[in-house]
Amino acid sequence: YIESHLRPQWGWRSIFGIIGFILIYILIAIDLEIDFSQLLKDSYLYMKDVIGRMLPPDFTNFKNLMLSMLETVEIAMMGTLLAILLSIPVGLFSARNIAPNYPVYLVAKTITVFFRAIPEFIMAMILVIAIGFGAMPGIIALGLHTMGFLAKFYAEAIEHVSEDPIQALESMGASKWQVISFAVVPQIIPSFIGNNLYILDRNIRMATMLGIVGAGGIGYELQSAFRMFQYPRVSAIIIVIFITIFVIDMISSWIRSKVV
């Protein structure tokens, strides 16, 4: 009885849904003219050739690589700080249960959707044209784009808090900010820390790419190596990026396990 109860019940809707899902992807593959057999064959040959050119890695001027990687991490950290500072008020106002009124909620929600919709890569290109090369375009691009994500995460966390502490404080005549400070904030702190660490980890990965458009960091070194066909240098840069992100991911996981 237990096994039959736990066994998934496949109705006609589920079956037709799965068939429809498969057909959609078959049609997409046909429309994009994807030949999987040729793709696998060509990918193997091309990857074998590229990997052969990239070995052994060229770690000359290792100090410059590490300084560029440090700049990338600094850009990501400053971009994350900017995102946190901007997303706190936007996240509060885009939460249905504590927004002052619907127009304020709608404006805040629109802001989060707008900045999520513009990739940081495109935003960095626009900012490089507007204010020039360097770290600042990367910081602003990461801050604005990830502000949209953080504000969304904050709002969702706020909307799922327990209503009992909120109602208790409101019944005692507490102000809106007192309710937020003493009933909402304590409940969302674990989510707040976890989301911030996730965004920092993500921003470090994205900051490596923003240098390609002139926003500073190791991405510029990567672009230069590709442009000069210095594939051993490219593999060295990729290794440095991988080790850095791996170490930071381990640190983030440790912090998350201790705090969240």
For each predicted feature, which ranges?
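Glycine-rich helix-loop "coupling/hinge" segments at transmembrane-helix boundaries
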Residues: 129, 206-241, 260
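Generic hydrophobic transmembrane alpha-helix motif, especially the helices
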Residues: 113-146
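N-terminal, non-cleaved signal-anchor transmembrane helix
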Residues: 1-81, 88, 93
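C-terminal transmembrane helix and the adjacent membrane-cytosol boundary/short C-terminal tail
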Residues: 194, 235-260
